[in-house]
């Protein structure tokens, strides 16, 4: 069971489900748990499990080089059959719970699934395009939450801000995965333009996040609580960008993930407090 939880990246899925809830709370301006929002969060959790598992199925060869002991499929701790079952069941659960909310959420779920399934074979080998695809999908939980409660426009600002951080983080992860990607002939951004230039791009996106995280929420009417809490996320991103400009990737991914969580809390506080 522990290996399965590692395969689906359970902690990341909890963050994604929380992102769906946060999007709903931002949209309604308060903490509430309507059935539609709970179903949307379950759908988001299930679809995230599909994406993570499918990615590992496609990346077994690279993971045997990059993460031989930590990726359950590459380490032989989870069978391909179990992984396929997770993909099938997760797709079914994700679509069913989305369908219990609205047709619009089903369409959003189908769009996310489409990107997930073409990502590894078609998008990931293409510099930047794969990073953009992951950022758009991974940053979308708040939008799904806002969509679930009938106010999709309220989820756009959180989606854009989350996507910026995910985009930078994906480039960092590509830099970390460069040895395995070279082994299987994959052409990611660090391989295409060089590790140094790729990290500069990631740092640039991180630096872009800082003014965006000030201007977009201000224009969207977020309250003062957002700006106080978001300062912590902005500082974390600035530290991460500095390390990237110095050519360092250690702990940068964790810093960016922490900034996402803090940013999510800030966005909710800015509409609820």
Put a short name on every predicted segment.
Residues 1-273:
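Multi-pass alpha-helical membrane architecture of UbiA-family
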């Amino acid at each position: 069971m522990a290996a399965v939880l590692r395969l689906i990246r359970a902690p990341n899925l909890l963050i994604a489900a929380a992102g769906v809830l946060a999007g709903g709370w931002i949209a309604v301006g308060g903490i509430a748990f309507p059935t539609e929002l709970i179903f949307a969060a379950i759908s988001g959790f299930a679809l995230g499990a599909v994406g993570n598992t499918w990615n590992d199925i496609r990346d077994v060869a690279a993971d045997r080089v990059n993460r031989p002991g930590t990726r359950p499929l590459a380490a032989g701790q989870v069978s391909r059959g179990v992984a396929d079952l997770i993909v099938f069941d997760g797709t079914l659960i994700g679509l069913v719970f989305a369908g219990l909310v609205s047709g619009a959420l089903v369409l959003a779920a189908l769009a996310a699934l489409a990107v997930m399934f073409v990502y590894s074979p078609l998008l990931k080998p293409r510099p930047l395009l794969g990073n953009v695809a992951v950022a758009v999908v991974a940053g979308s939980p708040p939008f799904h939450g806002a969509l679930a409660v009938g106010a999709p426009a309220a989820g756009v600002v959180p989606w854009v801000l989350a996507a910026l951080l995910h985009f930078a983080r994906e480039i960092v992860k590509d830099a970390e995965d460069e040895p395995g990607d070279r082994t299987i002939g994959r052409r990611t951004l660090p391989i295409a333009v060089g590790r140094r230039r790729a990290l500069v791009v990631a740092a640039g996106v991180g630096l872009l996040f800082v003014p965006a995280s000030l201007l977009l929420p201000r224009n969207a009417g977020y309250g003062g609580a957002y700006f106080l809490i978001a300062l912590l996320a902005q500082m974390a991103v600035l530290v991460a960008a500095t390390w990237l400009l110095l050519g360092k990737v250690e702990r940068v991914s964790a810093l960016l993930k922490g900034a996402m969580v803090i940013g999510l809390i800030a966005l909710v506080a800015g509409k609820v407090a």
